[in-house]
From Swiss-Prot:
This is Cytochrome c-type biogenesis protein CcmE. Heme binds at residues 131, 135. Residues 30-162 are periplasmic. It is a single-pass type II membrane protein. It is found in: Cell inner membrane. The lineage of its organism: Bacteria, Pseudomonadati, Pseudomonadota, Gammaproteobacteria, Alteromonadales. Residues 1-8 are cytoplasmic. The chain crosses the membrane at residues 9-29. The gene is ccmE.
Length: 162
């Protein structure tokens, strides 16, 4: 092989190796920032199409309805624990150590983002609450499908307490 051809081959191999290294670093960075969406039933039973369950320590997003009566606040800190359920009967405990959104209430839809622990709890780093009675996060609406049950409110007014 003459020196000119050898120099071109070395340059081509180095260029291909550099592109491969950059591509692998890019894919690694994207993979570490990937947050997969799960419903409580999918965390317990696995995804319906693949049966894949999230791994302990994996960063995920969970969407569903806050279970009425499940919220427990620590009186000395911002720590709060509540359960999130879906229409298929799955339920997961969520712990959060920050201020909850103003619109957060039991019985309403939320999306919590955080890390799954070994006990099957979600240590949330962010909690998003729905905005009004008609809004539901797209992932939650799609996952719950037609089985979402709205709360019924009567037109009867509360008695005057004055």
């Amino acid at each position: 092989m003459n020196p000119r051809r050898k120099k071109r081959l070395t340059l081509a191999v180095a260029l291909i190796g550099g592109v491969a290294a950059i591509a692998s670093l890019l894919l690694y960075a994207l993979n570490s920032n990937l947050n997969l969406f799960y419903t409580p039933s999918e965390i317990v039973n696995g995804k319906t199409d693949t049966g894949v369950k999230p791994d302990v320590g994996q960063r995920i997003r969970v969407g569903g309805m806050v279970t009425v009566g499940s919220m427990v606040r620590d009186p000395d800190s911002l720590h709060v624990q509540f359960a999130v359920h879906d229409s298929l009967g799955g339920e997961i405990l969520v712990t959060y150590d920050d201020l909850l959104p103003d619109l957060f209430r039991e019985g309403q839809g939320i999306v919590a983002q955080g890390v799954l622990t070994a006990e099957g709890k979600l240590e949330a780093t962010e909690v998003l609450a729905k905005h009004d009675e008609n809004y539901m996060p797209p992932e939650v609406a799609e996952a719950m499908g037609q089985k979402h049950e709205k709360l019924d409110y009567s037109q009867q007014k509360a008695p005057d307490t004055k």
